[in-house]
Structure formats: structure tokens, C-alpha cells
């Protein structure tokens, strides 16, 4: 019947590995290009890696693409990535291990442009984000007992941001600011 047309052969034979892997290291991410194995039933290529904060990530690319983009890296350093070819029977190849060394996440560049200005009942902030990455600015204020209280969270992907934190007492206060990205990478903290 017609249903036979849609049945596929299930096997237990692992596909071959990808080959000729090329690494393009960028800010907070890596693009890998490779030669796909000659497999009739190739489903996808999957990359597995562990971020600096211990989070395990997995990214996949279809059998019709010879590249995969890996995101979420914080500080630039060496990481190991395992690439697997996966067939339509969900058999995995042996891992093809690649060493990558992405540059620091763009949040660190944004952090270095942060400027603070006193404002009545608050503080004005200015920063530059030329790559228009999604960033989160966290702002804290020191309480009278010496503890730090979170007072504001600002989400932005603007190339140039001018923001203000208002509604605070019009008296001198100590502030602290940091940036994080959507992968929970954090910059150092700037104290004012």
C-alpha cells in the first residue's frame, strides 16, 4: 500500500564522521564548517560542548548544511567540541573532536564602554554595543547596613544606549553595575 512508500530502512550501522573541519573563532561564538560523510541516510550533524560555567550545550545542523554555529561562550579560552554524524536510525558516529578558542563574549567589550553620570535621584548610564548583542545590565545599590540590593535590570540590544535609573533617594549612594548575556556569562562588576 501507500504506507510502504513512507517506511524507511532502520539499521544499526553508525555513520562515518565529518571531516576537514575548519574553525572560525569569533566573539562568544564559533562557526565550524566541514565535509559531510557520504551517507544516504544522514539526518544531521550535532556538536556537543561544555561552557566555562559547566553548562552542556548541543547544537545541530541538518544533513543539507556543512556548517554549524556554536554560541554561549564567555571568556575566550580553549574548549573541546565533539561533532557527531547522526543517521535517520539515530545511530551516532564516533566523535570528531575539535579544539576551538572563541574570543571573549561581546559583553566584555560593552562593559569597557560603560560610563556613569550622577543624576538627581539616580544615575545616568551610557554604553556602546556595536554588534547589537542582547545584553542585560544589572544595577545594585549599597544599603545602609552594607549589603547590596538589586535595584534595576535593563535589557538592551541598541548600538548606543543612554539609560537612567531613577526614583532613588536624592542622597549620595554607592552603586555597582555588571553586564550579562543570554547565556548567563557575567562581566566583572563596576563600583561607583
PLM region spans:
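Recognizes extended acidic, P/S/T-rich segments that occur
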Residues: 42-76, 140-170
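Conserved aromatic anchor
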Residues: 28-40, 121-133
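Beta-strand-rich modules
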Residues: 1, 70-96, 161-191
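Proline/serine/threonine-rich low-complexity linkers at boundaries of modular beta-sandwich domains
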Residues: 7-16, 98-107
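Low-complexity, Pro/Ser/Thr- and charge-rich linker/hinge segments at domain boundaries
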Residues: 103-120, 192
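Surface-exposed, proline-enriched loop/turn segments that connect beta strands in immunoglobulin-like
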Residues: 17-21, 111-113
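Solenoidal tandem-repeat scaffolds enriched in leucines and small polar residues
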Residues: 123, 130-181, 185-191
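Short, small-residue-biased leader/transition segments that mark boundaries at the very start
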Residues: 2-6
